[in-house]
Amino acid sequence: MQRKVEVLVIGSGFGGAIAARRLAEAGVDVLVLERGPWRDTVPNRSLGLQNLAPLPQGARAYTHGLRNIGSHRLKKDLVLNRKGFIEAYQGDGINVICSSGVGGGSHVYAGFMDRPLVPDYWDNRHPDLCNAQMEGYYEELLATYKARPLTDSDQVPNAIEQTSHDGKLRCLGHPAVAFLMPQVPGQPARRVEDGVERWECDMANNSFLGSPSGAKTTLDFSTLWPAMQKGLQVQALCEVTSIHRLSPDRSAPMRYEVRYRNHANGRDECILAEHVILAAGGLSSVRLLLRSRDQARGLTGMPRLGLGFGGNGDYFGLWKENSDKDLSKGMPIGSPFRLKDSPNQSVLVLRAAIQGIDSVPMPGPCGAGCAGSR
């Protein structure tokens, strides 16, 4: 007999994990399909999770750093390691980097949790949606992830106030961060809360290569695991390949057939669902819908699918700071800033530290490669 579920969630990042948690708490039968694996971190080990795949730390950056590489010029992605961490895609006018694993983008985000810059961002978009309504959700998430703004008492290295180049840079405030900050600054300690073991932030390795210590709050242990105690099912290494709308049948509530590749056993499988929540990220969600409609012929309609696709406005720049400080220490991304006298009211500049890179073996004078070389 074919497997059936009331709600199927595709993707376990911020969209999928939070939706799945809410539904599971309401007693709904929910299954999450995630193409990536559970990651090997202190919190996940403490929960007794099995089949953990490494983060791209140290030499693992070469074996588990990239999952696949794609381009609008290629007919097919180049898959390097299905347990790899990063998907890199070169598009026509946009480049996308996203993570793969249970918890989705929470493994590579900087831990910032901030409201939109535009005060009325949610107003006049839909009759049932407004800024006042969204504020309640912002407050709920900040409380759930125990996120708070940094203060001087946290003694974070390389804060903008400390590296403003004699006042040329102006800090624009401190957004809330979802990090386990040290109770004693400079002395990160082990903490266990609700059965989850974590280490406080060491200001050194919680960036885009993941947070092995669990200092950064990720969705696997903070959102999905608690929901699993209330009935949520999560299947890792299951990559959805197409979605098919079923013919209406009043005697059967199932409305969709979802086909996926189970990378754990190498089989193509499928499941019937009454409802499907597609939360596989901006790139993968659009790609899956296009494939389901145009290749698998499982969906119809959606005439504007793929049009107006864009990112969240990020541009990457590289400049030399000539600092006598180790700017990799501190938070993964510093608080937003602008030039002191800038008239601009919309652009934010953020200093990013690619922490953990010093543990990756690099070619050096020693010939075979020296760990820690830059």
Ranges and model annotations:
Residues 1-4:
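A short, basic/flexible loop-to-alpha-helix module at the beginning of a structural domain
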Residues 25, 29, 35-53, 214, ...:
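Glycine-rich loop(s) and the adjacent beta-strand/alpha-helix scaffold that form part
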Residues 11-13, 103, 280-283:
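A short acidic Gly-Thr/Ser loop motif
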Residues 63, 70-73, 91, 127-239:
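Conserved redox-cofactor binding core of oxidoreductases
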Residues 6-32:
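N-terminal Rossmann-like FAD-binding beta1-loop-alpha1 element of flavoenzymes
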Residues 17-21, 221, 225, 286-290:
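Short, hydrophobic alpha-helix immediately C-terminal to the catalytic nucleophile
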Residues 52-150:
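Redox-cofactor-proximal catalytic regions of oxidoreductases
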Residues 78-97, 105, 109, 127, ...:
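FAD cofactor-binding and catalytic pocket of flavoenzymes
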